[in-house]
Amino acid sequence: MNDLLPAAAAPAGARALPLRHADPEIWRAVDAERQRQMHSIELIASENFVSQAVLDAQGSVMTNKYAEGYPGRRYYGGCRHVDVAERAAIERARRLFGCEYANVQPHSGSQANQAVYLALLAPGDRILGLDLKAGGHLTHGAHVNLSGKWFEALSYGVDPVSHRIDMDEVERTARRERPRLIIAGGSAYARVPDFARFRAIADATGALFVADMAHYAGLVAGGAFPSPVPFAHVTTTTTHKTLRGPRGGMILTDDADIARRIDAAVFPGLQGGPLMHVIAAKAVALGEALQPGFRAYARAVIDNARALCARLAEGGLSIVSGGTDCHLGVVDLRPWGLAGNAAERALEEAGITVNKNAVPGDAASPAVTSGIRVGSAACTSRGMGPAEFRQIGDLVLAVLGGLRDGGQAGGRDAVPARAAELSRRFPLPY
């Protein structure tokens, strides 16, 4: 009869079963994903491999706890232990990025940006961000996003030759349009933004300057990439990507008034209960980033990205902006007559994961694109170095070369085995 009981009425022992026995379908999906991560080359720039400690914290009993509010100011009882975790995350974020205030509750980078808009803008205000096809992010004013629907979104681009942000265009647009908010950062821009000039332009035009460092926060934490925090009124970030933590968001500022407004925007303005198991995992990841070894990791990420981009360029591929200053590179496939979606598909069949990506001046649809984005953070976490990334570059060239020459999945015969062997040499800890 017990197998007919609803879950809530099932014996306590049934609820103690491990996933493998409690829900075999989902266990198989989870294990298959673990195997995929273990045996493939991960080049998606926004992905990384967290530590076992981060996994442990995120899978902990803190997922059971509701904790609306902030440490010491909760709307629920029984929060003394989750308060320890959130306070630790806040203090570690402040130490790591050298700021006065940190809100660690946003569920994602997108919600961190939304909270900033809610705190600092009124509907219809003007915002100025990097154009999506030039490497910007949806939440910086794309017309399909809330940021482009609720606000008057303007964009700046990159120089058509150097593919670097045209700061003169930023200044001209800001002086002419007088945006309330200027945003620096993106999801596919490989160079260091001029944070000092962004702030100067904002000050000269009466705007607030927001830096979105979601992609390079870990590089900033490791001292390998300039920090926007001293220049921006507000800095937003994710806690995964190069920071190598759980999926989530965070907001940093040195301004007490802005901090109060952001806290109110996050809760109760945008979110209800924070995800305390995720915040605990954020604290763990931030603690890891404070360790001396993380600085070596951050430097290695950039060295590896440069090695990969250099090898791809040597093989005849066009790298947007000619290289990279961070963990990612964008490959313009138009000279090879390839579409981004076809390249993504062929590489995945060969055991190499990338994402299709728009390139400056792209006429293709977002579902097709004319480029791919590659990144080094994940494979660097596995211990790979420049020599391995040059090998990865050779594998990518073999696949795309075969595709260009007429094969639907170029390099199908040779590349998968080589990619799998490289993965086996650098196993994941789980």
Swiss-Prot record:
The protein's Enzyme Commission number: 2.1.2.1
Principal location class: cytoplasm
Binding site for (6S)-5,6,7,8-tetrahydrofolate: L132, G136, H137, L138
Pathway in which this enzyme or protein is active: One-carbon metabolism; tetrahydrofolate interconversion; Amino-acid biosynthesis; glycine biosynthesis; glycine from L-serine: step 1/1
Reaction(s) the record says it catalyses: (6R)-5,10-methylene-5,6,7,8-tetrahydrofolate + glycine + H2O = (6S)-5,6,7,8-tetrahydrofolate + L-serine
GO molecular function: glycine hydroxymethyltransferase activity; pyridoxal phosphate binding
Cofactor(s), names only, from the UniProt record: pyridoxal 5'-phosphate
Compartments it resides in: Cytoplasm
Gene Ontology annotations for the cellular component aspect, listed alphabetically: cytosol
Site location (Plays an important role in substrate specificity): H240
Gene3D superfamilies from the UniProt entry: Aspartate Aminotransferase, domain 1, Type I PLP-dependent aspartate aminotransferase-like (Major domain)
SUPFAM superfamilies named in the record: PLP-dependent transferases
Keywords: Amino-acid biosynthesis, Cytoplasm, One-carbon metabolism, Pyridoxal phosphate, Transferase
PTM-bearing positions, type N6-(pyridoxal phosphate)lysine: K241
Keyword Cell inner membrane: no
GO biological process, any: glycine biosynthetic process from serine
Oligomer and partners: Homodimer.
PANTHER family linked to this entry: SERINE HYDROXYMETHYLTRANSFERASE (PTHR11680), SERINE HYDROXYMETHYLTRANSFERASE 1 (PTHR11680:SF35)
Family: Belongs to the SHMT family.
Function, as annotated: Catalyzes the reversible interconversion of serine and glycine with tetrahydrofolate (THF) serving as the one-carbon carrier. This reaction serves as the major source of one-carbon groups required for the biosynthesis of purines, thymidylate, methionine, and other important biomolecules. Also exhibits THF-independent aldolase activity toward beta-hydroxyamino acids, producing glycine and aldehydes, via a retro-aldol mechanism.
Protein name per the record: Serine hydroxymethyltransferase 1
Species per Swiss-Prot/TrEMBL record: Bordetella bronchiseptica (strain ATCC BAA-588 / NCTC 13252 / RB50)
Lineage, top ranks: Bacteria, Pseudomonadati, Pseudomonadota, Betaproteobacteria, Burkholderiales
UniProt gene name: glyA1
